[in-house]
């Protein structure tokens, strides 16, 4: 979902994050709206090199087409389970 589709401003989102999330590190002052490969893009399309890539991004890149396809395939069958069942 894009920021423009929420009816919220970037400041609204920042205020909610600051209210409900523990601040363990300083956050970037932009809204990460999309990502592709090694870049994150803000709501204006400005690219930022993703030096803080998360666990999966470290090896696959943001929105890697093979990973996206595999996730879509999996969530069509089951999206969440717990460790008392084998899937």
Predicted stretch roles:
Residues 1-36, 78:
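Active-site-adjacent loop/helix segments that line or gate small-molecule/cofactor pockets in enzymes
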Residues 20, 25, 41, 48-52, ...:
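Aromatic side chains
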Residues 30-50:
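Active-site and channel-lining beta-strand-loop segments
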Residues 47-87:
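Glycine-rich loop-to-alpha-helix module at the N-terminal edge of alpha/beta enzyme cores
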């Amino acid at each position: 979902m894009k920021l423009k589709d929420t009816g919220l401003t970037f400041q609204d989102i920042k205020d909610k994050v600051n209210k409900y999330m523990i601040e363990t590190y300083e956050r970037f002052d932009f809204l990460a709206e999309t990502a592709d490969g090694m870049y994150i893009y803000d709501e204006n399309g400005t690219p930022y090199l993703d030096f803080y890539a998360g666990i999966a991004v470290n090896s696959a890149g943001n929105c890697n087409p093979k990973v996206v396809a595999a996730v879509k395939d999996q969530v069509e069958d089951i999206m969440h389970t717990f460790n008392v069942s084998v899937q």
